[in-house]
């Protein structure tokens, strides 16, 4: 078996779905290993645009298995609506498999997410999808799993045990409205009935596929800088998008992973609150936002924009074990006379070349920029690295130098045919720095 993990190397929205869709052409299985329906993926298939949040990107290809791993949290209502949408658009979703160990987002999780966010004054900026409260219940051993949802008797038992606790929290702590047991039970038992045929022990399934020599892609959600352990805590998600999260969130041993592809936007974007050292609060940021259509797939919120941050990216390469890079949105930078890359931070007279954990330091960090000449040419139809304008080639070369990691692919537009591989992604040879 060969396994490739695809991770977002920044604060999410790097275009992971596009590279996963491209890699799918030579793979057999795609596994989502963390996150939930708070993370949107936009892919184009046969000139159609698909916006997915719950399902792995591979679901749009009938020749692949699309697996929701144990590390993902599942909103059954949202999942079924997404499945219905794909069916109505003529897609075959019979390749879907859902881990029986995946945890279920319940209506009280969504309510608690909104109430907590309101109480904090929107400090974290969650999507209010119930992701955080679901992961919290998982850690507190108060969660409901898919294996419970598809068994009406088991579901009744766990719901009867946990619902009073949640209602107490909602009403007494936040002054919210309590949930009725029978209403939730009737609704969610029906969801379980509809999803039952897709639910299985995906750990056993993936092991079987591995022994058969199948190629497996592990698809991360969000980005490494939002990782619960390694991101800009507390302005983070509730799971581990890092490469190591793929093994935990899929039930697959780390020895089954051969490569970790870090997807990098050619600049930086972020949604919500939190430190952002290279943020551009000026006309340059506005131009990049509009040219790159930088609005959230799920939230529709305008994304914050900044120059490429090599300090943050070095941190991502380190903690995620990134072996190769995929550079997206290179075309968005066409037309700029100069492009900047942050290579270090200045804080209180000191120079930092690593990404600090201390939020106060991050919030006061002043980027040390390296300026690179830009290019004016339209590159949206370029297919080979050597055919890019010289300055665009130099920009890619400098990214490789700063991160000490080779580029596997680059994209010059949003469509699959505008993403170009520089080598066989399944090859063990990683020495492609500046050679293509």
From Swiss-Prot:
Binds 1 Mg(2+) ion per subunit. It catalyses: IMP + L-aspartate + GTP = N(6)-(1,2-dicarboxyethyl)-AMP + GDP + phosphate + 2 H(+). IMP binds at residues 13-16, 38-41, 127, 141, 222, 237, 301. Its EC number is 6.3.4.4. GO terms for cellular component: cytoplasm. Substrate binds at residues 297-303. It is an enzyme of class 6 (ligase). One of its GO terms (biological process) is IMP metabolic process. The active site is at residues 13, 41. The keyword Nucleotide-binding applies. Pfam families: Adenylsucc_synt. GTP binds at residues 12-18, 40-42, 303, 329-331, 411-413. The keyword Hydrolase does not apply. Its cofactor is Mg(2+). Mg(2+) binds at residues 13, 40. PROSITE patterns: ADENYLOSUCCIN_SYN_1, ADENYLOSUCCIN_SYN_2. Pathway: Purine metabolism; AMP biosynthesis via de novo pathway; AMP from IMP: step 1/2. It is found in: Cytoplasm. InterPro entries: Adenylosuccin_syn_GTP-bd, Adenylosuccin_syn_Lys_AS, Adenylosuccinate_synth_dom1, Adenylosuccinate_synth_dom2, Adenylosuccinate_synth_dom3, Adenylosuccinate_synthetase, P-loop_NTPase. Plays an important role in the de novo pathway of purine nucleotide biosynthesis. Catalyzes the first committed step in the biosynthesis of AMP from IMP. HAMAP family: Adenylosucc_synth (MF_00011). Homodimer. Belongs to the adenylosuccinate synthetase family. This is Adenylosuccinate synthetase. It comes from Oenococcus oeni (strain ATCC BAA-331 / PSU-1).
């Amino acid at each position: 078996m060969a396994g490739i993990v695809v991770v977002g190397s920044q604060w999410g929205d790097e275009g992971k779905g596009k590279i996963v869709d491209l890699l799918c052409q030579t793979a057999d299985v795609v596994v989502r290993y963390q996150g939930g329906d708070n993370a949107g993926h936009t892919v184009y298939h046969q000139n159609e645009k698909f916006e997915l949040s719950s399902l792995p990107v591979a679901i749009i290809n009938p020749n692949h298995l699309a697996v929701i791993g144990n590390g993902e949290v599942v909103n059954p209502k949202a999942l079924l609506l997404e499945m219905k949408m794909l069916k109505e658009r003529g897609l075959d979703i019979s390749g879907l498999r859902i881990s029986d160990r995946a945890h279920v987002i319940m209506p009280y999780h969504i309510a608690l997410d909104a109430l907590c966010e309101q109480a904090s004054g929107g400090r974290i900026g969650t999507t209010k999808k119930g992701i955080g409260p679901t992961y919290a219940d998982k850690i507190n051993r108060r969660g409901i799993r898919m294996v419970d949802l598809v068994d009406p008797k088991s579901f009744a038992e766990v719901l009867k045990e946990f619902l009073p606790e949640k209602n107490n929290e909602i009403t007494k702590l936040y002054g919210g409205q309590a949930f009725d047991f029978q209403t939730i039970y009737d609704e969610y038992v029906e969801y379980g009935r509809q999803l039952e045929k897709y639910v299985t022990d995906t750990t056993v399934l993936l092991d079987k596929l591995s022994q058969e020599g199948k190629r497996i892609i592990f698809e991360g959600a969000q980005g490494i800088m939002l990782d619960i352990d390694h991101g800009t805590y507390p302005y983070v998600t509730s799971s581990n998008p890092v490469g190591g999260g793929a093994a935990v969130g899929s039930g697959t041993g780390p020895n089954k992973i051969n490569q970790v592809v870090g997807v990098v936007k050619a600049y930086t974007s972020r949604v919500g609150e939190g430190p952002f050292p290279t943020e551009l609060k000026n006309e340059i940021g506005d131009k990049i936002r509009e040219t790159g259509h930088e609005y959230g797939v799920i939230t529709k919120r305008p994304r914050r924009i900044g120059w490429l941050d090599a300090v943050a990216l070095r941190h991502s390469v380190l903690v995620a074990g990134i072996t190769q890079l995929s550079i997206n949105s290179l075309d968005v930078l066409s037309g700029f006379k100069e492009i900047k890359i942050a290579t270090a931070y200045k804080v209180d007279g000191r120079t930092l070349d690593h990404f600090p954990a201390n939020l106060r330091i991050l919030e006061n960090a002043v980027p040390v920029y390296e300026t690179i000449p830009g290019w004016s040419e339209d590159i949206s139809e370029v297919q080979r690295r050597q055919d890019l304008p010289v300055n665009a080639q130099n920009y890619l070369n400098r990214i490789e130098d700063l991160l000490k990691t080779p580029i596997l692919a680059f994209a010059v537009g949003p469509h699959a045919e505008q993403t170009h591989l520089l080598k066989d992604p399944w090859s063990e040879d990683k020495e492609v720095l500046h050679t293509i």
